[in-house]
Amino acid sequence: MIKQRTLKNIIRATGVGLHSGEKVYLTLKPAPVDTGIVFVRADLDPVVQIPARAENVGETTMSTTLVNGDVKVDTVEHLLSAMAGLGIDNAYVELSASEVPIMDGSAGPFVFLIQSAGLEEQDAAKKFIRILREVTVEDGDKRATFVPFEGFKVSFEIDFDHPVFRDRTQSASVDFSSTSFVKEVSRARTFGFMSDIEYLRKHNLALGGSVENAIVVDADGVLNEDGLRYEDEFVKHKILDAIGDLYLLGNSLIGEFKGFKSGHALNNQLLRKLIEQTDAWEVVTFEDASTAPISYMRPVAAV
């Protein structure tokens, strides 16, 4: 049986919020079967919990924000991408502020944290959402689509009219039955244009942003001294973002996601449309792991 997974141990980290620039304390904790991923604003009295579900998404302007009443948690997508990539079904994410720390702008540090905590299998079957037919949403020339696929695959295309992008691959397709999320996707960093960052800072956004936690591009090229981690790091980061956004379904996917110039808003619209169309998907479990179209690494021991 493919079993649900949680963390073996509690683990903590500190970072800054990308938009607030505030110091944030992050604690990842194990959670019981069928809890899902739940964000906890531990700085509030009483504490407020926000389950990582598509219906709890509020703002999607610069990142994916979860809301519960007037309480919010910003920038959840990179951590959720790491949870999805490592097959974590159940965990509590405690925060001391309203934003998940940006770390280095990728999912890599979160992967390291989760692997350091160790993974523990639980005595219940892991639930997958299997896509049964195509579902699409569009906004102008932007598009996001689910199609049936025996496995989990994410295809993405970006289209930036800028010298840095024109010279590089702007499309990628990753089939996770043959490609490692940890090696090939998790280290791709978020990116931004210097002109946009200056504008955002004037409006009290991206206050924590720097070349330490993003790829910064100006008219001449990439400002980061170390350059890119992958030749196609820009589009790989969009894939990383999409994986995090898709995990707001609450379960791992069996199917393919295709994005063309899609972002957090369109990704969330697609999830909501899928959830509404109950004939387009089904929940499945696997008593025999060898029959599953998706396999996960064996739980790693805590480091």
Swiss-Prot record:
Pfam families, alphabetized: LpxC
Class of the enzyme per the UniProt entry, highest EC level: hydrolase
Residues annotated as binding Zn(2+): 78, 237, 241
GO BP terms in the entry: lipid A biosynthetic process
Domain of life from the UniProt record: Bacteria
SUPFAM superfamilies: Ribosomal protein S5 domain 2-like
EC number(s) on file: 3.5.1.108
Catalytic residues as annotated in Swiss-Prot or TrEMBL: 264 (proton donor)
Keywords associated with the record: Hydrolase, Lipid A biosynthesis, Lipid biosynthesis, Lipid metabolism, Metal-binding, Zinc
Catalytic reaction equation(s): a UDP-3-O-[(3R)-3-hydroxyacyl]-N-acetyl-alpha-D-glucosamine + H2O = a UDP-3-O-[(3R)-3-hydroxyacyl]-alpha-D-glucosamine + acetate
Cofactor(s) it depends on: Zn(2+)
GO MF annotation list: metal ion binding; UDP-3-O-acyl-N-acetylglucosamine deacetylase activity
Pathway named in the protein's UniProt entry: Glycolipid biosynthesis; lipid IV(A) biosynthesis; lipid IV(A) from (3R)-3-hydroxytetradecanoyl-[acyl-carrier-protein] and UDP-N-acetyl-alpha-D-glucosamine: step 2/6
Family: Belongs to the LpxC family.
Cited PANTHER family: UDP-3-O-ACYL-N-ACETYLGLUCOSAMINE DEACETYLASE 1, MITOCHONDRIAL-RELATED
NCBIfam families, alphabetized: lpxC
Described purpose of this protein according to its UniProt entry: Catalyzes the hydrolysis of UDP-3-O-myristoyl-N-acetylglucosamine to form UDP-3-O-myristoylglucosamine and acetate, the committed step in lipid A biosynthesis.
HAMAP family: LpxC
Protein name, per record: UDP-3-O-acyl-N-acetylglucosamine deacetylase
Lineage: Bacteria, Pseudomonadati, Pseudomonadota, Gammaproteobacteria, Pseudomonadales
